[in-house]
């Protein structure tokens, strides 16, 4: 089924983590097992954040060491926000899948089917390419110690014992791997499903635009009744889209806002780290790791900002699309409905962050990048 490709594999992983609501018919042992899975990943994240915090306190006077901690600390904070948000809002968020599979969002023409298929292909390609690049970045983080004669651990967190001993080193290395990979996949899953939901919302708006533009002229008296019915269907369809948009915003708003704030910390720390490296000093592999991770972080915030911006663009076309229909020959009642719909369509859809005046958009993405570079330049000047 085409619609299932928008979310299928991501929901499976959410179920593995124990953050997605089980069906009402689930047995008690399934619910207990789900709670155990959620507790396991929550404890791992909590221990990671605790060890990162201790490492930061131990090196409070050394800027570069603190920024090395921020390299992953901020990312894990956003992971914790995503995990807790999904668990706390699981009952409401389960309605997303029900809404997407609802016949109310079904296609009515071959052209609409083509629109849905194009977005499905785009979603699958983005999920796969983003997943491959993210896993590649995580693998590099784990592999880099091999090029340093195992002189350091993959993540800059507190060492619970001396890494000079092989048993202690590999025990901590294994712990770092167990911590890093599930949270990496959580990021991939959440970000790709957020993009999928926004794309599905966008294609619903495109379908509504198409239906409004196809509203035809009045040739016979009974055509006014047919047009009145189609207008009411479009108005009801728009109301369903708005309700779906509210669910999507609930999914994205909290974790996405935390992600934007954490991204600034990660981008600044990566830029500062790269500015202190030199290929001549044998830092090529470390620079490659940081560059790829930087690209993943930029991609992570770009996909949500871009898809949200597309929703805003498509919703802003609604008013023009209904005006483009052949409304001049309709009766007064239908023209009144058109006027009411145009007033409703006048405000485009925005997916806001915690700050109501700051929405997810390409402008927001540009602001994040500019802000990160400004903080980096200031930090570099202060420490030069």
Swiss-Prot record:
Per the UniProt record, which residue ranges are transmembrane?
A: 38-58, 66-86, 131-151, 166-186, 248-268, 284-304, 349-369
Can you tell me which residues are glycosylated?
59, 370
Keyword tags = Cell membrane, Glycoprotein, Membrane, Olfaction, Receptor, Sensory transduction, Transducer, Transmembrane, Transmembrane helix
Q: Do the record's keywords include Transmembrane?
A: yes
Give the tissue specificity: Isoform B is expressed in the antenna.
Q: Where in the cell is it found?
A: Cell membrane
The answer to keyword Metal-binding applying to this record is: no
Single GO term (MF)? odorant binding
The record places the following residue ranges in the Extracellular compartment, namely: 59-65, 152-165, 269-283, 370-384
Which residue spans belong to the Cytoplasmic compartment? 1-37, 87-130, 187-247, 305-348
Name the Gene Ontology biological process terms: detection of chemical stimulus involved in sensory perception of smell; sensory perception of smell; signal transduction
Comment field (misc) = The atypical heteromeric and topological design of the odorant receptors appears to be an insect-specific solution for odor recognition, making the OR/Orco complex an attractive target for the development of highly selective insect repellents to disrupt olfactory-mediated host-seeking behaviors of insect disease vectors. Odor-evoked OR currents are independent of known G-protein-coupled second messenger pathways.
Q: Could you describe the subunit structure of this protein?
A: Interacts with Orco. Complexes exist early in the endomembrane system in olfactory sensory neurons (OSNs), coupling these complexes to the conserved ciliary trafficking pathway.
Q: What job does this protein perform? A: Odorant receptor which mediates acceptance or avoidance behavior, depending on its substrates. The odorant receptor repertoire encodes a large collection of odor stimuli that vary widely in identity, intensity, and duration. May form a complex with Orco to form odorant-sensing units, providing sensitive and prolonged odorant signaling and calcium permeability.
Family of this protein: Belongs to the insect chemoreceptor superfamily. Heteromeric odorant receptor channel (TC 1.A.69) family. Or2a subfamily.
Instruction: Report what the protein is called.
Output: Odorant receptor 46a, isoform B
- Tell me the name of the encoding gene: Or46a
């Amino acid at each position: 089924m085409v619609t299932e490709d928008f979310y299928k594999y991501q929901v499976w992983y959410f179920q593995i983590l124990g953050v997605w609501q089980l069906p009402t018919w689930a047995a008690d042992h399934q619910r207990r097992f789900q709670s155990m899975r959620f507790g396991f990943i929550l404890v791992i994240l909590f221990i990671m954040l605790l060890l990162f915090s201790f490492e930061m306190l131990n090196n409070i006077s050394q800027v570069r060491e603190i920024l090395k901690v921020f390299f992953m600390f901020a990312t894990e904070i956003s992971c914790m926000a995503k995990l807790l948000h999904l668990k706390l809002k699981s009952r409401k968020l389960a309605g997303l899948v029900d809404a997407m599979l609802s016949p109310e969002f079904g296609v009515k023409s071959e052209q609409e089917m083509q629109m849905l298929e194009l977005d499905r292909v785009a979603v699958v390609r983005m999920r796969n390419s983003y997943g491959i690049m993210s896993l590649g970045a995580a693998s590099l983080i784990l592999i880099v110690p091999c090029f340093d004669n195992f002189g350091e651990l993959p993540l800059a967190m507190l060492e619970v014992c001396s890494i000079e001993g092989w048993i202690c080193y590999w025990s901590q290395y294994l712990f770092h791997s167990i911590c890093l990979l599930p949270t990496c996949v959580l990021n991939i899953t959440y970000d790709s499903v957020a993009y999928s939901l926004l794309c599905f919302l966008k294609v619903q708006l495109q379908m509504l635009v198409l239906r409004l533009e196809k509203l035809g002229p009045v040739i016979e008296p009974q055509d006014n009744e047919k047009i009145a019915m189609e207008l009411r269907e479009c108005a009801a369809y728009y109301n369903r889209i708005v309700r779906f948009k509210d669910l999507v915003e609930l999914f994205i708003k909290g974790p996405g806002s935390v992600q934007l704030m954490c991204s600034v910390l990660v981008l600044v720390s990566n830029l500062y780290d790269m500015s202190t490296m030199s290929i001549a000093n044998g830092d090529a592999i470390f620079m490659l790791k940081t560059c790829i991770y930087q690209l993943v972080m930029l991609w992570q915030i770009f996909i949500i900002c871009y898809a949200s911006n597309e929703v805003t663009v498509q919703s802003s076309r609604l008013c023009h699309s209904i005006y483009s229909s052949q409304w001049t020959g309709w009766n007064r009642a239908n023209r009144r409905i058109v006027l009411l719909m145009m007033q409703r369509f006048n405000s485009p859809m925005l997916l806001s962050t915690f700050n109501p005046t700051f929405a997810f958009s390409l402008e927001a993405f540009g602001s994040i990048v500019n802000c990160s570079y400004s903080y980096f330049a200031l930090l570099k000047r202060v420490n030069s």
